[in-house]
Regions:
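Short glycine-centered, acidic/aromatic-flanked micro-motifs in structured strand/loop junctions
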Residues: 46-50, 203-205, 278, 363, ...
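General beta-strand structural signal in soluble alpha/beta enzymes
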Residues: 5-6, 46-48, 73-77, 98-99, ...
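Buried hydrophobic positions in well-ordered alpha/beta secondary-structure cores of metabolic enzymes
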Residues: 8, 46, 84, 97, ...
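Proline/glycine-rich low-complexity loops and linkers
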Residues: 76-78, 127, 131-146, 150, ...
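An N-terminal, well-structured beta->alpha segment
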Residues: 1-68, 75, 94-95, 170-201, ...
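Gly/Ser/Thr-enriched, mixed-charge loops and adjacent short helices
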Residues: 2, 109-257
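N-terminal small/polar loop signature for handling phosphorylated ligands or for N-terminal nucleophile
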Residues: 28, 32, 43-108, 216-277
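Phosphate-binding and adjacent anionic-ligand microenvironments
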Residues: 108, 263, 304-497
Length: 497
């Protein structure tokens, strides 16, 4: 078993499918693929977050990258992923290798790769690297010397593992702070002026590595920030580092209300996802935040309004409804920002967004960047004179209120089983499934004229089936949860002999 390719990079369970040695072999294959593609050895930045064995993996990656032909290697502790993308885009490196599992639980770790011009590797390069990784794993055998057995390490074990690995490797150790400062300065420079509206905010870093960077941005905006979970921790303080989970947003929402703050910001473990919370402690869904920022850019004539907008198949339908008013094309892509970045690179779109707080705007770069999104939000609040809560309420009044739902069902299913299970679940909830438009951009998606929709797709990282959808708020209370439950039962029935 090896790390599996995910929506962004490669992920595995620590001590099992993820080991520092395996991460180093993967890094070597990525460098090899990039060398073959570019015709020369890349300059490489190696970053790592606070997860177990991350430092050990990063140190072995430094050696592996050097051995594979990298021209220069720098290692940076706690480098947020959007900052790494910015640095590659700015020409400080041709490749960033980041030891992180992003929003996944603390039992996971992995490797993300960012190439020129500051985004995930293009699809062909990623496939080539993955094929080389397969070859490398077969050559290494099932149990390479020095890899952990899968049993949990204690602190002494981890300290010994972290202590070694670079005695004969040439590298430069760098502090992330100056690069974070450069990134924030770049983001603010892309606005007509730095927004001038002091606010009280709550920032929850979920004990990952991006909370302190978001605090730096708040300082630059003259926002007074209350920090939560802004000190990195290997177990993320017992809270999942995924802001899309309601439980992970709860303490920020409570703090916003207790502190009488204007808004809250919750970022994921490596900083490439952000959720906003309004002054009433209510979550602003990512597609609502995306729509607000798109409308603001449209009014202020920012960006390239002649270009399209891209969303993933799991993104709320509000963005399509909004863009239809402006006659802007919307391109729907599979889940994973690696499917949206190429459209930014090609100039076909000037903004892209997913369903989990992963937003990008062309003025800031070609990869998702919560720092850019928050800077735009600051500009919106300063120029509109309205609160985030008021802006969202107006948006819902004009375009309708939909309840978002997302759930997970264990086990696998074929496309046919997903299609049949979705139809069965929709009919149990009172829909006429025969009237649905079915698309297969990623999994099976049912869309209705009412704006409601249901998507069933296999998870690329943790396995099982992801269930997403939006239902009108006027439906009976609990309708979204009931639909998710019907999907689970229908899938179980489809799998039964």
């Amino acid at each position: 078993m090896r790390m599996r390719r995910s929506a962004d990079g490669w992920r595995g369970l620590i001590g099992s499918t993820f080991t520092p040695e395996r991460a180093a072999r993967l890094a070597a294959t990525i460098v090899t693929a990039v060398r073959a593609h570019d015709g020369g050895g890349p300059r490489v930045v190696v970053g790592y977050d606070c997860r177990r064995l991350g430092r050990r993996a990063a140190r072995l990656i430094v050696r592996a990258a050097s051995d594979a032909g990298a021209r220069a290697v720098r290692i940076v502790e706690h480098l947020p992923t959007p900052t790494a993308s910015y640095l590659v885009g700015a020409g400080d490196a041709e490749l960033a290798l980041l030891v992180t599992a992003s929003h996944n639980p603390p039992e996971w770790n992995g490797v993300k790769a960012k190439g020129r011009p500051g985004c995930p590797l293009d699809a062909e390069l990623e496939r080539r690297a993955d094929a080389l990784f397969d070859d490398s794993e077969r050559a290494a055998g099932d149990a390479p010397f020095g890899e952990p057995s899968g049993e949990p390490f204690d602190q002494a074990d981890e300290a010994r593992a972290d202590a070694g690995g670079l005695d004969d490797a040439i590298f430069e150790a760098c502090d992330a702070s100056p690069w974070i400062d450069r990134h924030i300065a770049h983001v603010l420079s892309r606005l007509p002026a730095t927004p001038d509206l002091p606010l009280r905010v709550v920032v929850d870093g979920l004990s990952g590595i991006a909370g302190s960077a978001m605090l730096h941005l708040c300082d630059a905006l003259r926002w007074s920030a209350t920090p939560l979970g802004c000190a990195p921790s290997a177990d993320f303080g017992g809270v999942a580092p995924d802001p899309s989970l309601p439980a992970s947003r709860r303490r920020a929402a409570e703090a916003v209300c207790a502190e009488h703050a204007d808004l809250g910001l919750v970022v994921d473990g490596d900083g490439d996802r952000v959720y906003a919370i309004d002054s009433d402690g209510r979550t602003v869904e990512p597609h609502e935040l995306f729509a607000l920022l798109l409308a603001h850019r449209h009014r202020r004539r920012y960006g390239h309004p002649e270009r399209g907008v891209a969303v993933t198949a799991a993104t709320g339908a509000l963005v399509q409804r909004l863009c239809a008013r402006w006659s802007r094309p919307v391109i729907e892509q599979p889940v994973g920002f690696k499917h949206l970045s190429p459209l930014l690179v090609e100039g076909r779109i000037d903004a892209g967004g997913g369903s989990v707080g992963d937003l990008a705007f062309a003025e800031f770069g070609v990869d998702r960047d919560p720092f850019g999104a928050v800077a735009l939000l600051a500009d919106l609040l300063a120029t509109s004179g309205q609160s985030l809560a008021a802006l969202v309420a107006d948006l819902r009044h004009r375009y309708g209120r939909f309840d978002w739902h997302e759930s997970h069902v264990n086990g696998d299913a074929t496309d046919t089983q997903l299609r049949d299970a979705g139809r069965r679940a929709l009919e149990r909830c009172g829909f006429d499934a025969r009237t649905a438009r079915i698309t297969t951009v990623d999994g099976i998606k049912f869309s209705f004229d009412s704006g409601e929709w249901l998507l069933l797709r296999p998870s690329t990282t943790e396995g099982g089936i992801r269930v997403y959808g939006e239902l009108l708020s006027t439906r009976a209370a609990g309708a979204a949860a009931a639909l998710a439950a019907h999907v689970a039962r229908a899938l179980a029935a489809e799998r039964s002999p």
